[in-house]
Amino acid sequence: MYIEVTVDLTNYEGTVLDLRLSDRYTVKKLLDIAWQTTTISRSPREGHWVRVVNKNKLFPGHLTLTDCGVTTGDRIEII
């Protein structure tokens, strides 16, 4: 299923992205897509950790978005 999420890159570039993608992607794949879209020069930190802001939970990069409970409308901050 496709979900629409907001990706917060304030720890890197200060930009915010709205993306539509599959909930079967891993968190690492989400980061790869965000990096390709914004062409950020810094690489993401080891572990590819993210925080789902509206659920106040942290997740590592190897989990899928479904495993993290990410749904349409969530805001994801890249740590």
How should these model regions be labeled?
Residues 1-6:
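Short structural boundary motif marking the start of a folded domain
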Residues 11-29:
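Short, contiguous acidic and Ser/Thr-rich linear segments
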Residues 12-14, 44-66:
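Short acidic beta-strand-loop surface patches of small beta-rich interaction domains
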Residues 23-43:
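Short amphipathic, charge-patterned alpha-helical segments
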Residues 73-76:
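Loop/turn positions that initiate beta-strands
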